[in-house]
Amino acid sequence: MEKITPPADAEDILTIGAIDNMGVNAAFSSIGNTADGRIKPDVMAMGVHSAVIGVDGGTAFANGTSFASPIFCGLVACLWQACPWLTVRQLIQVVHEASDRNAYPDNIYGYGVTDMWKAYQLAMKLKADTDGK
């Protein structure tokens, strides 16, 4: 059975898998839970035929989780900037809950593709619930 390996298996981090524009897992994207059974990858992002800046400064297209991860990292950075009260664990929680496979995560797609608007709304609800206590 395949396992996600270090450093992607660390706790309290988001591990990002790569999908294509049809939402299909990329053949090069690691699969498998962690050695202690946690779901990894956490979520998926575009990593096949991703638009990147080429060596000539123009647009190029490339494949890899090395592209999926920074694409998703940028989205999460925007979410955290909008919701700076979130702890790391709360941030991961809203990302998981806002993903399309949240109800049935697996060791290929994790929690799936995240709807960042939904993640923002969940973060705002979490703040309202916390402020109301």
Predicted regions and their residues:
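Generic alpha-helical structural context detector
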Residues: 14, 41, 77, 93-96, ...
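Residues at secondary-structure transition points
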Residues: 23, 38, 70, 116-118
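N-terminal low-complexity, intrinsically disordered patches enriched in charged
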Residues: 26, 73, 119-121
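Short intrinsically disordered coil segments
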Residues: 31-33, 58-60, 65, 131-132
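Short capping/connector residues at structural and topological boundaries
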Residues: 33, 55, 114, 118-119
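Secreted peptidase-domain scaffold signal
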Residues: 118-133
